[in-house]
């Protein structure tokens, strides 16, 4: 399975939101998500929570541009999915794009069994790191193309194999949330060089949670 849509939980007390599933109570294997995910709490690029009634998430890839909470006190925000081990939840063989923003910041990790998964990289000379091909290449359910998204076989409609624009546009900065904008302000006002980069505002931004906002630049 896969999902390319953005997922947003509106208002307070919005729990367990993920790019593919909110709560995983069964077995989810070999899926990917590319849309951005935002909710109040318990947010993951692929699944919000893994573990209800012994759920498992295996060989999945999060290619989301950003996952985030709706406010500064939001908790359990992860690249792949939050694991409820007390209920028998488990994760294994999972990866996430290394450039994904988690509450406005990138998170480096190499744990394929953890909530953030292990880093999967993309660069123009080398393309996608080999883990993506290992998961989807040669599988009977998928048609795999080098350095592109796999598409499901025997499924109607139109499917796109294009990678998310944020993975291939290294000179663009995408602003989806207030946290993204705050990070941009910190980078620019802190002296980090932004020469040659294009900043794109992707959503309306509410800065009411940020008191004494300092203008950018």
List PLM regions with ranges.
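Predominantly extracellular beta-rich ligand-binding scaffolds that present long acidic/polar faces
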Residues: 1-217
């Amino acid at each position: 399975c896969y999902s390319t849509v953005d997922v947003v939980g509106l208002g307070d007390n919005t729990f367990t939101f993920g790019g593919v599933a909110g709560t995983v109570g069964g077995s989810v294997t070999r899926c990917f998500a590319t849309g951005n995910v935002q909710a109040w709490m318990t947010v993951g690029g692929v699944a919000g929570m893994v573990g209800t009634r012994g759920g498992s998430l295996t060989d999945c890839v999060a290619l989301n541009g950003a996952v985030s909470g709706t406010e500064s006190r939001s908790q359990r925000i992860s690249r792949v999915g939050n694991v409820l081990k007390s209920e028998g939840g488990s994760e294994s063989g999972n990866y996430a794009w290394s450039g994904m923003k988690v509450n406005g910041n990138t998170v480096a990790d190499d744990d394929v069994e953890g909530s953030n998964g292990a880093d999967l990289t993309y660069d123009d000379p080398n393309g996608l790191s080999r883990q993506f091909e290992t998961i989807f290449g040669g599988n009977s359910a998928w048609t795999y193309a080098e350095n592109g998204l796999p598409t499901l076989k025997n499924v109607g409609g139109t499917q796109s194999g294009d990678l998310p624009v944020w993975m291939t546009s290294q000179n663009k900065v995408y602003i989806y949330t207030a946290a993204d904008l705050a990070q941009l302000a910190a980078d620019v006002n802190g002296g980090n060089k932004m020469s040659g980069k294009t900043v794109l505002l992707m959503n309306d931004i509410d800065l009411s949670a940020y008191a004494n906002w300092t203008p950018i630049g």
